[in-house]
Amino acid sequence: MAVSASLVKELRERTGLGMMECKKALVETDGDIDVAIENLRKASGLKAAKKADRTAAEGVVAVKVAEDGSYGVMVEVNSETDFVARDAGFLAFVDTVVNKAFDTKATDVAALAGDEIESTRQALVQKIGENIGVRRVQLIEAGSGVVGAYLHSNNRIAVLTQLTAGDVELARDIAMHVAAVNPQVVNSADMPAEVVEKEKEIIKAQPDMEGKPAEIVDKMMVGRINKFLKENSLVDQPFVKNPEVTVGKLAKDAGAEVVGFVRFEVGEGIEKVEEDFAAEVAAQVAASKA
């Protein structure tokens, strides 16, 4: 049957899908828009499944902290391309995810990704045409202290910090420092032994160590390991907004100590497959024939 342009327009407005996809759905249902929507919803699950094997290494992070600093949550939601990561619909989905995490104090993705979140995700995959996934979620509760957060302007780096005391603004300043400098641990004593041992091996292999007496090598080793620990321990680092004081001193002057921090950066740890243009076109042609 012939489908009117107004009906196609209505379906597009209600689903956000493309004109040809909407027209096809209406033709298949003889113009029944409700059945067309139902069929499209069913199809979205299949479409989402087909895209699930594609690497989603772009995206954004989001963070939300209680006004009193009693707790905060942070999430990472991935897309395949940076272009989609700036899409209004994608960003609205991220807001839904972080608000759900905040309201429920979610501690893992499985607990967060209920029917509502999953159905919204699948509908977005259907509309945008990319694999989209909620990768991780982090909850930090302040206890008797305070939690602060920082989200970088590009939405690709976010940090939650926990202090024993102080206020949300101090915790936020320290979170901003963590975002900028990326320390490995809070205190040097927290550095994993295997990391220290690996650094020692690197130092021993440096040319200026060759041929020196053992006692000299040992002294140089101690000095360089201490330097490495200071450079990578949050409380020993010069505060990014005032290098005259360390982060530890900044917190101490406010009657606080840094308990911990968590830093999310979009795509860290994900191996992104790089394809050349010819390979990408070939893959798309093969997919269209499947």
From Swiss-Prot:
Pfam families attached to this UniProt entry: EF_TS
Keyword flag Cytoplasm: yes
PROSITE patterns: EF_TS_1, EF_TS_2
Region Involved in Mg(2+) ion dislocation from EF-Tu, annotated ranges: 81-84
Keyword Cytoplasm: yes
UniProt main location, coarse: cytoplasm
Protein name as annotated: Elongation factor Ts
Lineage, highest ranks first: Bacteria, Pseudomonadati, Pseudomonadota, Gammaproteobacteria, Cellvibrionales
Designated gene of the protein: tsf
